């Protein structure tokens, strides 16, 4: 049975104390508000000094913790202390720190329930080659994908595979399409790898030089993949699973992004039975529990091909507003399994991140893209950050961006990389 978000008013479990990690992310802010609205007490642990949720009225307390990536042992020790001091009932990792939480999950479960699967399973899903191999072994549709572990392998593979099609090159450990190399279109007005609607294009490509990264960026420790380029529509999913059973699911269009293939800034619910069937089969076959997202291409043959997996919270959360039913999927998934229910967003749900969405609008003007469609999307979407009764995060986001910009300058990295540098996980301790 499918239940639309907002259609039911079931009594939730008694008020819980919920600890969220990853307070910098808009999904964490949105979920904190949903939990608060449902009567739960929300606490946040975050390694960044400036983050969206720290000033939210939905949050009881925030704690600044050590970097999960750079000081994992101290980070986990602090989470243990907070779980005890705040008498936490449920810990929900929201961003890439989920991998570090998984390392200490057994210790943390002494004090509270932890919504995370094993580190071994998380790694298999996060690794862009191992995930493809797993999905293929389950009989699910995925693109042809090759593992590249050296400059020599890169050159050898490139000389063979690029004679039979176009390819996307990307690190196996990456996020928000960072460092992705897309095929380049001949039409300079079109974005590399996408058409004027934001879909993957089948236009002819021009030859371009695709030199391999240096030995530091490409090795057996930091491999890349070459993945067959499939023209079609991009789709994303967000799901919550409990012991292999889906208790919440959303498929959404994310046609507006930061750059041509970067992080999504606009989210619109779509009905897509094939994407749902793919995710359901994967969850059942792997017995997965927790939050999980997938990126798909719907090819011209109408089949969906999974290109990546994100075993954590993704922006599909925003489509479940106001979120009472989604909260049930997180706090009492076993009840939904017994009831045979799966929560989905209301039909036509839309959400956006207003500031980067404005930047996307500028791209429409400069790139001669369909500004009218962008305006319609803007007018029909809820801003994730702005809530009249919780206004402070609107102002906080400017401080977050400024802090990230300063870090990006000092570290000589992109703004996106600066936003995740201290929580990202690249296969450490495997």
Q: What do these predicted ranges mean?
A:
Residues 1-117, 152:
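ATP-binding N-terminal substructure of ATP-dependent carboxylate-amine bond-forming enzymes
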Residues 121-141:
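Glycine-/Pro-rich loop/turn segments that contact NAD(P) or position catalytic residues
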Residues 135, 143, 159-180, 194, ...:
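ATP-grasp fold ATP-binding core
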Residues 177, 256-259, 310-323:
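Glycine-rich phosphate/pyrophosphate-binding beta-alpha loops
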Residues 184-257, 261, 268-274, 298-305:
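Phosphate-binding site of ATP-dependent enzymes
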Residues 200, 328-430:
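Peripheral (often C-terminal) accessory segments that flank ATP-dependent C-N-forming ligase machineries
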Residues 262-265, 270-294:
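Oxyanion-binding "anion nests"
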Residues 284-319:
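Conserved metal-phosphate-binding beta-hairpin within the catalytic cores
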């Amino acid at each position: 049975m499918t239940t639309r978000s907002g259609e039911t008013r079931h009594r939730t479990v008694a008020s819980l104390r919920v600890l969220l990690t990853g307070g910098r992310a808009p999904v964490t802010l949105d979920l904190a508000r949903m939990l608060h609205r449902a009567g739960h007490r929300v606490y946040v642990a975050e390694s960044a000094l400036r983050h969206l949720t720290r000033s939210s009225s939905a949050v009881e307390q925030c704690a600044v913790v050590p970097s999960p990536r750079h000081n994992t042992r101290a980070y986990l020790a602090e989470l243990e202390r907070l779980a005890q001091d705040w008498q936490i009932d449920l810990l929900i990792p929201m961003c890439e720190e989920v991998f570090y939480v998984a390392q200490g999950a057994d210790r943390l479960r002494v004090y509270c329930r932890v919504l995370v699967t094993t580190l071994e399973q998380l790694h298999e899903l996060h690794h862009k080659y191992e995930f493809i191999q797993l999905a293929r072994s389950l009989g699910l549709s995925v693109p042809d994908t090759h593992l590249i572990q050296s400059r020599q392998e890169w050159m050898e593979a490139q000389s063979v595979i690029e004679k039979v099609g176009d390819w996307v090159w990307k690190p196996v450990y990456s996020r928000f399409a960072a460092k992705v190399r897309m095929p380049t279109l001949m039409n300079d007005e079109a974005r590399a790898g996408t058409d004027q609607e934001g879909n993957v294009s089948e236009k002819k490509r021009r030859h371009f030089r695709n030199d391999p990264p240096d030995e530091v960026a490409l090795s057996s420790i930091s491999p890349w993949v070459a993945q067959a380029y499939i023209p079609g529509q991009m789709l994303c999913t967000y799901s919550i699973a409990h012991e292999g059973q889906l208790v919440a699911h959303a498929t959404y269009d994310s046609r507006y992004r930061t750059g041509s293939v970067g992080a999504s800034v606009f989210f619109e619910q779509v009905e897509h039975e094939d994407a749902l069937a793919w995710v359901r089969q994967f969850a059942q076959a792997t017995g997965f529990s927790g939050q999980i997202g997938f990126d798909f291409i719907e090819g011209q043959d109408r089949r969906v091909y999974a290109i990546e997996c994100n075993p954590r919270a993704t922006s599909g959360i925003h489509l479940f507003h106001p979120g009472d039913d989604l909260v049930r999927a997180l706090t009492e998934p076993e009840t939904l399994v017994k009831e045979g229910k799966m929560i989905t967003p209301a039909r036509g749900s839309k959400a956006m991140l207003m500031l980067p969405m404005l930047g996307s609008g500028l791209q429409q003007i400069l790139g001669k893209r369909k500004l009218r469609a962008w305006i319609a999307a803007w007018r029909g979407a809820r801003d994730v950050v702005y809530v009249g009764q919780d206004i402070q995060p609107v102002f906080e986001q400017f401080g977050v961006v400024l802090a990230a910009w300063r870090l990006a300058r000092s570290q000589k990295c992109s703004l996106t990389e600066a936003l995740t540098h201290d929580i990202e996980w690249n296969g450490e301790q495997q």
